[in-house]
Amino acid sequence: PGRAGAVRVGNILYVGGHTAPQQFRGKLGAEITVEQGYEAAKLACLACLADVKAAIGDLDKVKQVAKLLCMVNCVPDFGQQPLVANGATDLLSELYGDSGAHARSAVGMGSLPNSACIEIEMIMEVTD
C-alpha cells in the first residue's frame, strides 16, 4: 500500500527505482566490473519497462523517454558511472530510436538496497 512501480500524472509517467537481478549484487570497482554493471543496467531498465507496460498497457504508448536516473553502488574512487549507465541508455535507444534519447544523471552511491549494484528511475511522456 502506498507504493506503485509507476505513477501516471497526465501524460507523464514516473517510474520508481528498479534494480538488476540477484546475481548483480555488490559494488562497482570491487565485486562488479564495468561490463557486468552495463549488463545490470540493461536488466534494471527492462524491470522499469515491465512496470511501464503494467501501467499503460503497451510499450508503444511511450512517446518520449525524458529522464533517466542511474544510481551506481560503487567504491569511493570509482568514476565510471556513465559507462555503467550506458547499458540502460543503449537499450532505450535501441528500442525507441530518437524517442529514447533522454536527459540522464549517473551518480555514485555508497550503498543501495539489498547490495544492488545499480538502481534506475525513469520519467517518460506517454500517450493514450
Model segments located where?
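Short, polar/acidic, helix-capping and beta-turn segments at strand->helix junctions
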Residues: P1-D128
